[in-house]
């Protein structure tokens, strides 16, 4: 055991003398490693008489534990000293201004959708949504769109198969909402729609908001009043609005809505009309009792008019120089 005490004393001295973590690890290996001095002591127990092995093993394990504790304590002290030296070497100028956190901003299309939702929400319109992959019934048939209508061709619509396609408008949401409820209805349906078109004023994917009100004694004058108020609210000024006769399969009568620009020219902004009786019949609503109006608008077009953007494609090119203007 005298030799064991000598090993402990030497180990303690080496641990205290270690001035770095690297040197301390070398001391650990010297005494506790696979070929370390204390490990060798444990391996030599087999040479002792059986009656001495137990006591000797206890003494060696006790010594091993003491060395491990001493190494852990020295390691902690060295790490603290290293951190203190690092902090002392680093200087912080507390007079420097802080780093400015740059806030993000909503996309202009998102801003427009939120403005539309807020206006109609204040009039009691709910916001509904539906699938972007639509079937022929909800996208065409229930909306009184005939089999030979141009919208049913590959030229205008992205088909998966003859009965499944990317929706060309959010009107399918109107059908689904009426299928799942009973009149009266008052809601808008914003969302992405898809058409096979790409140029300065068209993209294959764009955003649309359609609205519908179905109740007893609904008339065109109510539709005109709501849309006039909406456009004045959206452009934040009193705008001159006109309604032109038009044609949509799902409304009768139908109209295009224009606003007069600052240059005196009329600009088309949305379409509308009274819900066609066939559309009401397709969802089990009696057109003799109920009537309704519907309207639809392209979000990007309204956004272009509001912010003076000339190219629709700019909204989807993710150019921060463009998008930062709307923060």
UniProtKB/Swiss-Prot annotation:
EC identifiers of the protein: 6.1.1.20
Pfam family, one: Phe_tRNA-synt_N
Binding site for Mg(2+): 252
Disulphide linkage map: none
GO biological process terms on file: phenylalanyl-tRNA aminoacylation
Key words of the record: Aminoacyl-tRNA synthetase, ATP-binding, Cytoplasm, Ligase, Magnesium, Metal-binding, Nucleotide-binding, Protein biosynthesis
Molecular function, one GO term: tRNA binding
NCBIfam families xref list: pheS
Record protein name field: Phenylalanine--tRNA ligase alpha subunit
UniProt organism field: Vibrio campbellii (strain ATCC BAA-1116)
